[in-house]
Amino acid sequence: MHYPLSLALAFLPFGIQAQQTLWGQCGGQGYSGATSCVAGATCATVNEYYAQCTPAAGTSSATTLKTTTSSTTAAVTTTTTTQSPTGSASPTTTASASGNPFSGYQLYVNPYYSSEVASLAIPSLTGSLSSLQAAATAAAKVPSFVWLDTAAKVPTMGDYLADIQSQNAAGANPPIAGQFVVYDLPDRDCAALASNGEYSIADNGVEHYKSYIDSIREILVQYSDVHTLLVIEPDSLANLVTNLNVAKCANAESAYLECTNYALTQLNLPNVAMYLDAGHAGWLGWPANQQPAADLFASVYKNASSPAAVRGLATNVANYNAWTISSCPSYTQGNSVCDEQQYINAIAPLLQAQGFDAHFIVDTGRNGKQPTGQQAWGDWCNVINTGFGERPTTDTGDALVDAFVWVKPGGESDGTSDSSATRYDAHCGYSDALQPAPEAGTWFQAYFVQLLTNANPAF
């Protein structure tokens, strides 16, 4: 999976040696290349695996990326008449009782992503790219989910919910809702390498994860008057459907189920609506995978005592599939269920038959250009010929789908193309992956430019 940049950048001086280009790697565990940057760039430590050359002028403060545009919000379009029943706008109403939990709210604009665009992207849009500055500014204002991909990021949830609470108290109309991704399972990303997490099952990872969830719950209880939308553990359950032949996934199965159960039961709060990640059409939409996937999702839901706050499933997270497409691209390899609408309408009845009346959200953050440049449907890393997609809205035209959302912040890398890196995944070196690419979660300027250029609708 693919996860966002660390909370802030720490700037470290290095000795005089060969210089790395802007956005290139300049440090990290196991790295042996150039450790200084060209003029106008500064080497910024992102995490233990990666340091990146970023524009010096836009990153002089280690707190810039955390604080810029923290009060910005954007409304969610709610003009459709084909939705699930619209419920009360009260942030303390249980999601399952109030219908579509997105209706009647505007979504909080991810302040960290907004400041990445302002501090990293826009200063580099010069010369022939200067015409994209207005589009970049607009993209920064589109609400996207905040990823809680390490325990260290959990306190920022409190900062953001406090800001939302303050704006709502000041009369925000419609009231603002927060959006977060819960993403820190032990032995995370078990079928890939690019987004390995901080916890290991062998090193008390399950207990560490439960503490992580406890911290999130504490914040949600503290801000019980703020309506909060959660996506739960991208890729995790989908890996248990198709990848148990991978030793790491087989070994992680019981821990994934225990941890997911803990998350669903502990975060089952009146001000919360949760969506379990459900892969995408190119993963679980295959006819042979639909019933096993439905069986697993229904089992997880029922084993958690059918939590009222679990509204349904999230699809296409960090992926590229069309919501609907008239002709299946060649890379869908003969599967007639080749878009997210078909996938959702195929799996929903299978869930309903087992007592899980699931509704859905779809990540449209990077699916604006169709077909994409994928050579194979399973190619997921920094895929070429992609663009920003439909803006967040409840106007989906399908009663099963609560909203189109931007879960993956567009412009943050899916994984490094450096084959010598500790977390290198071969998918990031494929011919349909934009290269050279930095580590997962770090800013990838060329990819952001691609998304802007191919945005549909355009900014």
From Swiss-Prot:
Disulfide bonds join 26-43, 37-53, 190-249, 381-428. Residues 19-54 form the CBM1 domain. Residues 76-97 are annotated as: Disordered. This is Probable 1,4-beta-D-glucan cellobiohydrolase C. Coiled coil: none annotated. PANTHER family: 1,4-BETA-D-GLUCAN CELLOBIOHYDROLASE C-RELATED, PTHR34876. Residues 54-94 are annotated as: Thr-rich linker. The active site is at residues 189, 235, 414. Residues 1-18 form the signal peptide. PROSITE patterns: CBM1_1, CBM1_2, GLYCOSYL_HYDROL_F6_1, GLYCOSYL_HYDROL_F6_2. Pfam families: CBM_1 (PF00734), Glyco_hydro_6 (PF01341).
